[in-house]
């Protein structure tokens, strides 16, 4: 049969159901017609000629099983109905196998979409870590940024160079503007929402309950991503405070030593 998409499988199933209904209608018409012929009363002249005849032999068998009527397998109408019934049975078997294939294909696509969603979240997280790097601009970081790709923002895309270079403040540290950060969160949430919708097969689900379920899954995914990002951000802030504190202490000691040397020099100069 080859590779088929879920939409194609559903279209084939609908065609099978339509053919099944039409076959059932034809079988019903044949059965009904044959039954009416089998129970049709004989004319009065035949009854007068053979008033004591065997009624069982005069009765014509019908296809629909009725108590008191036998089925004649040699009747062409019966053979036609049986042939249609065999075709309908084979069609039902094809329907069962196609539904099984549809179920397996749906599960595989769902698992694939979930894996893609996790991969996309990991890519976004790696790009965030590279963009938030504080310190020297290593060549390997630029190479990694180019490899990861750009992150969506309000201006459609933010290139790795823009994230790395233009976000530097005068002190030489990297910082992401609030607008870019908020836009990134919004777009990341929208991306997660779309992946969750496709992953769970809710493309055809409408209404409040379906949208609420998709929204809840997206929120959980974004909260997990935000928790990881927040913990890393707090750790970086602590390190920055520690480095600034160490710099102030070092600067204070150097200044105090210079002041003492200057005072001593002034005293010596005053002595003449």
Swiss-Prot record:
Single GO biological process annotation from the record: response to gibberellin
Keyword annotations from UniProtKB, A to Z: Chloroplast, Coiled coil, Membrane, Plastid, Plastid outer membrane, Transmembrane, Transmembrane helix
Transmembrane regions listed in the UniProt entry: 207-225
Gene Ontology cellular component annotations, sorted alphabetically: chloroplast outer membrane
Role this protein plays: Component of the plastid division machinery. Required to mediate the dissociation of ARC5/DRP5B from plastid outer envelope membranes (OEMs) at the midplastid constriction site in the cytoplasm, thus triggering ARC5/DRP5B ring turnover at the chloroplast division site. Binding to phosphatidylinositol 4-phosphate (PI4P) modulates negatively chloroplast division.
A GO molecular function held by the record: phosphatidylinositol-4-phosphate binding
Coiled-coil regions listed: 78-102
Positions on the Chloroplast intermembrane side per record topology: 226-272
Record InterPro entries: PDV1/PDV2
Region span, Disordered: 40-61
The protein's name in its UniProt record: Plastid division protein PDV1
Induction notes from the record: Induced by gibberellic acid (GA).
Tissues and organs where the protein is expressed, per its UniProt entry: Expressed in young developing leaves, root tips, shoot apices, and flower buds (sepals, petals, stamens, and pistils), but not in developed tissues.
Location of this chain's protein in the cell: Plastid, Chloroplast outer membrane
Topology in the lipid bilayer: Single-pass membrane protein
Organism lineage: Eukaryota, Viridiplantae, Streptophyta, Embryophyta, Tracheophyta
Keyword Transmembrane: yes
Free-text disruption phenotype from the record: Reduced number of constricted and large chloroplasts due to a blocked plastid division. Accumulation of ARC5/DRP5B in the plastid outer envelope membranes (OEMs) at the midplastid constriction site in the cytoplasm.
Residue ranges that the UniProt entry lists as topological domain Cytoplasmic: 1-206
Quaternary context: Interacts (via C-terminus) with CDP1/PARC6 (via C-terminus). Interacts with ARC5/DRP5B.
């Amino acid at each position: 049969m080859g590779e088929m998409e879920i939409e194609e499988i559903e279209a084939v199933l609908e065609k099978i159901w339509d053919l099944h209904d039409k076959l059932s209608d034809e079988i019903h018409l044949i059965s009904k017609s044959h039954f009416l012929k089998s129970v049709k009363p004989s004319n009065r002249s035949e009854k007068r000629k053979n008033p004591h005849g065997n009624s069982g032999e005069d009765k014509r068998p019908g296809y629909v099983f009725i108590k008191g009527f036998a089925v004649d397998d040699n009747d062409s109408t019966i053979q036609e109905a049986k042939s249609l019934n065999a075709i309908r049975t084979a069609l039902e078997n094809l329907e069962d196998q196609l539904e099984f294939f549809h179920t397996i294909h749906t599960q595989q696509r769902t698992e694939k979409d979930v894996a893609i969603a996790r991969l996309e979240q990991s890519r976004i997280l790696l790009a965030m870590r590279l963009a938030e790097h504080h310190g020297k601009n290593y060549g390997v970081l630029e190479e990694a940024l180019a490899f990861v790709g750009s992150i969506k923002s309000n201006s459609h895309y933010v290139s790795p160079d823009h994230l790395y270079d233009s976000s530097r403040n005068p002190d030489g540290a990297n910082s992401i503007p609030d607008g870019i950060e908020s836009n990134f969160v919004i777009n990341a949430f929208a991306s997660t929402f779309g992946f969750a919708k496709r992953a769970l097969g809710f493309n055809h689900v409408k209404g409040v309950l379906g949208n609420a379920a998709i929204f809840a899954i997206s929120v959980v995914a974004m909260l997990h991503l935000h928790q990881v990002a927040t913990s890393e951000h707090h750790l970086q802030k602590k390190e920055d405070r520690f480095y600034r504190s160490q710099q102030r202490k070092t600067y204070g000691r150097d200044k105090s030593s210079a002041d003492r040397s200057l005072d001593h020099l002034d005293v010596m100069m005053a002595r003449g």
